[in-house]
């Protein structure tokens, strides 16, 4: 059949799979969708996320570093994870809990996030906070976020927000959002 012959042509070409996937008849790409819009709720988009952003090496014995955040943000990540635990002298730290990984001060991590959050992307940044701190260090954590991020941190609903519906990336602009558990 003609259809089978057309498919065989794709198989014989050196870049056959790419040709097949970008063809008008079979392509995953559709020209009508080439220009993204940013007016739908944030939950309507795929978000480039980084899990265990702070870890270099294994998650049981690796090093926790600020460089992991810098690298993820420069590569366009729009969601980074911060595992926050109690640190000495009342200062929260980022580490992979109950493991042999090293610790990095939360203050250093948030300073790096503030510096690199919007260098490679203008889209909102989500801070996924996993908070294991006692109440006193939770207050310090909140203070660090407010102080280091300033106006970049969304601390209240935006004007005209619809309850239960996330605003669009267009509406957030260059803002940092936090989600804690």
Regions found by a protein language model. Give the residues of each.
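Single conserved hydrophobic/aromatic residue that forms the stacking wall/gate
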Residues: 1-10
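EF-hand and EF-hand-like Ca2+-sensor regions
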Residues: 11-45
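Chitinase-like catalytic core of GlcNAc-active glycosidases
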Residues: 36-164, 172-175, 179-180
């Amino acid at each position: 059949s003609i259809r089978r012959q057309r498919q065989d042509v794709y198989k014989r070409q050196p870049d056959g799979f790419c040709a097949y996937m970008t063809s008008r008849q079979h392509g995953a790409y559709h020209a009508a969708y080439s220009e993204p819009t940013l007016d739908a709720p944030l939950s309507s988009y795929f978000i480039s996320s980084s899990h265990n952003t702070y870890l270099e090496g294994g998650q049981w014995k690796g090093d926790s570093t600020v460089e992991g955040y810098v690298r993820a943000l420069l590569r366009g990540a729009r969601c980074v994870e911060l595992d926050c635990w109690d640190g000495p002298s009342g200062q929260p730290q980022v580490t992979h809990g109950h493991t042999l990984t090293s610790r990095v001060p939360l203050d250093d991590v948030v300073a790096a996030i503030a510096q690199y959050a919007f260098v490679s992307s203008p889209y909102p940044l989500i801070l996924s906070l996993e908070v294991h701190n006692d109440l006193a260090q939770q207050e310090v954590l909140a203070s660090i976020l407010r102080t280091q991020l300033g106006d970049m941190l969304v601390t209240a609903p935006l004007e005209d927000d619809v309850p239960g519906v996330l605003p669009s990336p267009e509406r957030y602009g260059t803002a940092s959002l936090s989600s804690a558990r």
